[in-house]
């Protein structure tokens, strides 16, 4: 690059080259925008590495991680290579909307720490609109239309995904913020710390980023491993919020306990132990789920050796 770019767009990739091509096609290939694609050890049976997406682009950096460590690790590799004043994150199966580049140009020289943008969501295959990101747009619009401190805090603390926002790189660097290198929910703690350390924010509700949903992606995984990881990230996040006097924004954990018990009592008590380690508030949201949890527990009591499941 002949000059320092304004923006660094970090995109982790794993086994979805066609969707990555779509994502890259939505990004201008210009010197103001540094694109960093980090491949997380994709399979050569799926990806043609001799013609890897982005190879033909002048302002795109390709990194190849030979150990499959997940999107969190991949994003951390991207952060180490980021040269822009601003950070933008994207998933390889998502894409930017045309309004993105005109909108962000308004903030090139702004002093904000975070600029929140509107989000659209569609089915990845047929591009049919879905409601996956409705909650984010709801808190975004509420904070925009009624910018009380409570509404602004709700937006900052509960917008726990890295995309749909522009982040000042110095905020991340100066506070040594990195992504968790877990298989699931690796972006939650990063987004939480970015929110907690930010001082000035801006809201633009114009839809600039499109989130897609497809069968079999990590977001939809409901295995015991996924549940344990997401639960631990949640109670860790709740602990961080308590330490920073935002306990009112803690996420109730009773839902996780109910889902764990639906899998097996063994998984349920694994979550209890994790919660104790992080001093979790087991009673927040408990009333809503008590009857369901007891019902599932009694059902397991009728099985043979439920604790071994």
Model-derived regions: residue spans:
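Glycine-rich, basic loop-to-helix element that forms the pyrophosphate-binding segment
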Residues: 65-82
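Short, well-formed alpha-helical segments that are part of the catalytic scaffolds
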Residues: 11-29
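Membrane-interface aromatic/basic loop that binds lipid-linked glycans or pyrophosphate carriers
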Residues: 1, 29, 50-54, 58-60, ...
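Acidic donor-binding segment of Leloir-type glycosyltransferases
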Residues: 24-64
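Short aromatic/hydrophobic "clamp" motif used to bind/position activated sugar donors
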Residues: 87
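Cell-envelope/extracellular polymer assembly enzymes that use nucleotide-activated donors
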Residues: 5-8, 26, 34, 189
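Catalytic core of nucleotide-sugar-dependent glycosyltransferases
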Residues: 206-215, 220-248, 253, 267-278
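Donor-binding/catalytic cores of nucleotide-activated saccharide
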Residues: 72-75, 92-192, 197-201, 212-225
């Amino acid at each position: 690059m002949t000059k320092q770019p304004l923006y660094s767009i970090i995109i982790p990739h794993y086994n979805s080259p066609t969707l990555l091509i779509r994502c890259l096609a939505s990004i201008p290939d210009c010197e103001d925008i540094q694109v960093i694609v980090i491949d997380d050890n994709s399979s050569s049976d799926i990806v043609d590495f001799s013609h890897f997406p982005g190879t033909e682009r002048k302002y795109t950096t390709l990194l190849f991680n030979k150990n499959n460590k997940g999107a969190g690790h991949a994003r951390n590799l991207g952060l180490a290579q980021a040269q822009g004043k601003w950070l933008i994150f994207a998933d390889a199966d998502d894409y930017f909307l045309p309004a993105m580049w005109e909108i962000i140009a308004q903030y090139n020289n702004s002093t904000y720490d975070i600029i929140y943008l509107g989000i659209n969501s569609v089915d990845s295959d047929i591009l049919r609109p879905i409601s996956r990101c409705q909650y984010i747009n709801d808190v975004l619009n509420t904070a925009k239309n009624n910018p009380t401190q409570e509404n602004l805090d709700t937006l900052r603390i509960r917008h726990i995904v890295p995309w749909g926002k522009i982040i000042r790189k110095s905020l991340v660097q100066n506070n040594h913020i990195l992504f968790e290198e877990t298989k699931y929910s690796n972006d939650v703690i990063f987004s939480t710390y970015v929110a907690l350390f930010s001082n000035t924010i801006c809201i633009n509700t114009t839809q600039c980023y499109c989130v897609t949903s497809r069968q079999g992606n990590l977001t939809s995984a409901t295995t015991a491993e996924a549940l344990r990881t997401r639960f631990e990230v949640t109670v860790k996040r709740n602990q961080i919020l308590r330490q920073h006097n935002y306990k009112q924004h803690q996420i109730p954990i009773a839902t996780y306990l109910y889902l764990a018990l639906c899998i097996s009592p063994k998984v349920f008590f694994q979550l209890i132990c994790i919660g104790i380690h992080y001093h979790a508030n087991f009673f927040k949201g408990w009333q809503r789920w008590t009857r369901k949890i007891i019902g599932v527990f009694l059902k397991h009591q009728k099985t043979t050796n439920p604790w071994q499941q």
